[in-house]
Amino acid sequence: MSHYFENDNNIKSNERIIYVKVNDIELKFIADNGVFSKKGLDFGTRTLLENVNIINSNCSILDFGCGYGPIGIYLSKKFNINVDMIDINKRAINLTLKNAELNKVNVNAFESNIYSNVSKKYDYIVTNPPIRVGKKILYQILFEAKQHLNKNGELWLVINKNQGAKSLLVDLKKEYNAFVVNKNKGFYIIRAINN
């Protein structure tokens, strides 16, 4: 069985248009088979976008696991900023580039297996992480983020209570100044500051 966090060229393409409105920002996306949440913006990502707080529009942002691009494109549109976006999935990167053009935003989207192709540090890393990769890889994603954050840089993520939000928060507090910003229907929005 194929997953959205893998490259599978055998998945038949079936592109569709998705319309999204978050915090009065209207966006249009092309989604496809083989990417996460292909039928519409998922509740966890929506909750993350409704809560993420970028206080400096002159900052650097990385969207980790960008899928077809809703997080990075939304942040680029809202804050009028260039966002770097990564995913291991080639189809996701291609969709992100199409969607950036469709929404008239500046992003830099590229393939990366976790942080293998990330060479700089960011003020913000924002993610709805791929929980289904398993705890070991999930923790690698979240704890290696520290090496790609500037001092006082922030990791923002969403995770469901049923997917281990409470235990993850305990573990994040060992490496970051981490806390819950908001909870909504079992989804935790976590902000982890690299200090």
Task: For each feature predicted by the language model, list its residue ranges.
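N-terminal auxiliary segments of SAM/dcSAM-dependent transferases
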Residues: 1-22, 34
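Conserved SAM-binding loop and adjacent beta-strand
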Residues: 32-50
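Conserved SAM/SAH cofactor-binding pocket of Class I
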Residues: 44-127
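A short glycine-rich, Lys/Arg-flanked "PGG" loop and its adjoining helix->strand segment in the class I
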Residues: 139-151
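Conserved beta-strand signature within the Rossmann-like core of class I S-adenosyl-L-methionine
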Residues: 152-159
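Conserved class I S-adenosyl-L-methionine
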Residues: 160-175
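Core SAM-dependent methyltransferase catalytic element
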Residues: 183-195
